[in-house]
Amino acid sequence: MMLTKHEADQWFAEHSLPDIKIFPNKDIEQHLRYALSQVNTHDLFLEFGVRDRKTFNIIKEYSNVVHGFDSWTGMPWPWQLTRLVEPAKTGPHLAAKTIPKSDDTQIFWSGLFEDTLPKFLKEYNQPISFLHIDSNYYKSATQVLTALNDYITNDTVIVIGQCHAFEQADLKKWGNVWNHGLLACKNWGRNIKFFSRNHFLQVAGKIT
């Protein structure tokens, strides 16, 4: 089910712009801000995987309202290199210390994506300007892309975290499991073109 390093490298190259912008470090904020600067519409801004709101607060600087999705209880499955198997056992992996409160500028959806997405779509069925998926699991990333498919347009900027180990050292440390974001995009079936990436796991692209 997982992509090998060679398969992931090849698929990513085939779906990247020739002049893809590469940030030569592992700084998530710098790359995230660049991706946000490429947004040219003012519709929905969404983040899946909020946790401590570090990236969420950055996204808020670019939109009047941002929707955040998370369980805030930790990983729904054990965080391990065999995570794509996704056993039923649960645990408080990476749980947030506090659950944030919603207001006029931030709306939080607490629970598993499969439970909160249907509720969200009943209230908000409009195009998506910016989508940040930082879900840690292939299953979760696939749920997001599938549920929001009709609202992802050519103007939607998509940022996916934990997407691909570009360095052999990272691959040795984490294994092919870090290709889960890339695999979700591949199996999604839409023609995505990546326009930027940082040096570790985070990529950004648009549908063409």
List PLM regions with ranges.
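S-adenosylmethionine/decaboxylated-SAM
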Residues: K5-H15, Q38-T208
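Conserved alpha-helix/loop element of class I SAM-dependent methyltransferases that forms part
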Residues: D27-D43
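Conserved SAM-binding loop and adjacent beta-strand
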Residues: L17-Q30
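N-terminal pre-catalytic "stem/leader" segment of glycosyltransferase-like enzymes
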Residues: M1-M2
